[in-house]
Structures are given as C-alpha cells and as structure tokens.
Amino acid sequence: MQAWVIGNWKQNPATSHDVDALLNELCTAISTTKQLSHNNSTRCQIMVAPSFLHLAAVSSRLKDTSVLCAAQDVSAYSASVGAYTGDCSAQQIADVGATWTILGHSERRQYHQESNDTLLQKMTHALTQELGVVFCIGETQAQYDAKQTLPVIDSQLAVVKKLIAEQPEVIDSLSTRLIIAYEPVWAIGTGKVPTVSEVSATHQYIKQTLAGFADSLSNMTVLYGGSVNADNADSFAADPMIHGALVGGASLKAESFLAIVTAFSKGSM
C-alpha cells in the first residue's frame, strides 16, 4: 500500500517570504533525495496543508511537482458561495488548485466546537467539489486514561457511517478520496507518544470498523499523527497497520519532514 506523509502547517509560517523559503527548501531536498525521486514517488505520497492565505501560492508552486496541496478546513455552510464571513468554500479551495482538505482536527473540534453534524456537512461539501478528505479522529488524555479510546473512535467515525447511509452514491469513491488520520489529542505537540503496538492496534480497529460500514472500505489508508518526528518515524513506518503520518511541527523544517517521508518510503517497499 502506498504511504502518505502530510504536513499540516497550521497557522504557520508567518510571512509569504517564509512560505517561499520553506517550499524552496522542500522542493530542492526532494529533487536531490534518491528515495524521493519521481520514479519512487509512488511509494510515499507527500502533501502539505498551508493556511488559507497561502493556499493559492503554495498550490501554484507545487503544480508541476509530485507534492499535493490540501486545505486545513472547508466551510460547513455552502459548497460554493454565500454570506459566511471568514469562511472558504470547497469550490474556492478546489479552484486554486488544492485537491484535498483536512477535516475534524482536534484543534478545530476544541477551539471551534465542531460537532459530528458540522463535520458531515463539511465532508459532503468537500466530496461534492471532488476534494479528498483527511478525516482526523482521536481521544483526549482523560478519555485515554479512562480506556475510552475505542468508544470515542466509534462516535467520531459515525460521521462516515452517516455519510454512507445518506449518500450511498459516494461509497465507491471513498477508498481513494478518504483518509483517516488517528491523532490522540494528548500526543499532539506534547512530546508524549503512544507505543507503536498501541497505535497499530487502534489502526486495526479503525480499519475493521470502516469495513463494517461497506465492503469497499476494507483497505482504507489510516495515518498516525501526534508528535511524529525524525527520531521515531522509522518505528512507526515499520508497522504494516500504519500507512503514513500527519505531521505538525516537524513539517515546518524540510530536513525533519523529509526524514519522516524517507522512513515511510522505505517502510512501504
């Protein structure tokens, strides 16, 4: 299975100059790294998700490369246009060249109180505009301590289950247009990292749950996110249940980001 490594830049970098510098560093490093050459790019798909403000510029810069560009969110209220101050629609995102979007990140759930109903609307709009969706799920520290990881995952994956129930016509496309990113909230940016065996078992549960929704979802891509870095990427990449990584802070430096990409490129061989 092809691996995926996705850099979620969040609200970074601060300036267009810094974005250009990061892109130049990233593209130069990719072109000079044998394992990341065009001939080997099918082993690991690289994608970056800049802020809305930089999305068009980054998408344009990456147009003739193997690196994909994603948004970090889409509007829940309209797939196209409307009086929704501050929102960007899926159509607008697709129009500037992005082909994917992240949805359901824990920071969006926490700071913007995003519910399952909201996420269902966003996912519907994204798929309507032919955007792929990286759907983030994961438990908090309190839920982990209470051994509620699997029930929490069930409740969050209910968005996918409801999507299929309400729009069965999308089922066949989800195997290539939906990626699940398991990000335990307590591990994001904290330096705390679950064991590889814990992540592997959780990924197996996610895959089994999705397969229960529809036979065509039996081989879904499931990524891990949460303090993934150059030092621990090899151990995650070696596990067949872990198909890649959603990377936060480590994606803001080309060297550390590409070390993770290289690890998963080797792991998918």
From Swiss-Prot:
Q: Which InterPro entries match?
A: Aldolase_TIM, TIM_sf, TrioseP_Isoase_bac/euk, Triosephosphate_isomerase, Triosephosphate_isomerase_AS
In what pathway does it function? Carbohydrate biosynthesis; gluconeogenesis; Carbohydrate degradation; glycolysis; D-glyceraldehyde 3-phosphate from glycerone phosphate: step 1/1
Q: Which UniProt keywords apply?
A: Cytoplasm, Gluconeogenesis, Glycolysis, Isomerase
Q: Does the keyword Isomerase apply?
A: yes
Record-annotated residues binding substrate?
8-10, 189, 227, 248-249
Reactions this protein catalyses: D-glyceraldehyde 3-phosphate = dihydroxyacetone phosphate
Q: What is the similarity comment for this entry? A: Belongs to the triosephosphate isomerase family.
Instruction: Supply the EC number(s).
Output: 5.3.1.1
The question of whether Glycoprotein is a record keyword is answered with no
Gene Ontology, cellular component aspect: cytosol
Which Pfam families does UniProt cross-reference here?
TIM
Q: What does this protein do?
A: Involved in the gluconeogenesis. Catalyzes stereospecifically the conversion of dihydroxyacetone phosphate (DHAP) to D-glyceraldehyde-3-phosphate (G3P).
> Subunit info?
Homodimer.
Q: Name one GO biological process term.
A: glycerol catabolic process
Q: What class of enzyme is it?
A: isomerase
Q: What is this protein called?
A: Triosephosphate isomerase
Q: Where in the cell is it found?
A: Cytoplasm
* Highest taxon of source: Bacteria
Gene Ontology terms, MF aspect: triose-phosphate isomerase activity
Active site per UniProt: 105, 183
PROSITE patterns in UniProt: TIM_1 (PS00171), TIM_2 (PS51440)
